[in-house]
Amino acid sequence: MVTMVPPLFFVCALFFAEGIGLDRLCIAALSPRCTLFHTCRFLFLGGILITGNWVCIHYVYDPLALRFLTPLGVGASAFCLSTCSGKLSRTCTSHRAQSEWGLLYALVFYITYTALNLFEALVMWGVSCVGFLCFSTILRAIHQRITQGNGTAVEKTAALLLASMGFIALSLYGTDELWLFPIPAAGMRTRL
């Protein structure tokens, strides 16, 4: 079984090096209720996407030799599901983060190509959502500590800059670590 550390690093790299989904992360960090709501929503949406795309890959694309359509299928389903769920739920914030579908696309695409079976893909998705929850909580704690402190503007900015540098260093380390774990070839996958 593939180690569960790379999905967590991949989430970190997407957030803090590429900027994908960073506005969603900041919105989720506004309050504990928003953090939990967005994490559960993200877990549910991703579970649907991974299961649906896994079935499409193995029972539609592979038999018809259309595996090259996988990125288009993942992108279309992530965009549609994210847009529909955003129109249905308006809790926690009225501002809809536009990059949520990009974050969904990147994570689902990475997991469907890395995992060897559906169970492993869903476990990796759970680990990614735990990373989402952890980073939201850390951002909320940093924001509260900085805004409630009695320091000057320079001291508050320095603390935020230091925290951001730590996140970026962790994401770059995670991106380098990802190259150590080979992605299995399409023909070496196991069936459901």
Curated annotation (Swiss-Prot):
Q: Where does the protein end up?
A: Cell membrane
- Predominant location of this chain? membrane
GO CC: one term? plasma membrane
Sorted alphabetically, the keyword list is: Cell membrane, Membrane, Transmembrane, Transmembrane helix
**Membrane-protein topology:** Multi-pass membrane protein
What is the protein's given name? Uncharacterized protein TP_0148
- Name the residues that span the membrane: 5-22, 42-61, 66-88, 101-118, 122-139, 159-181
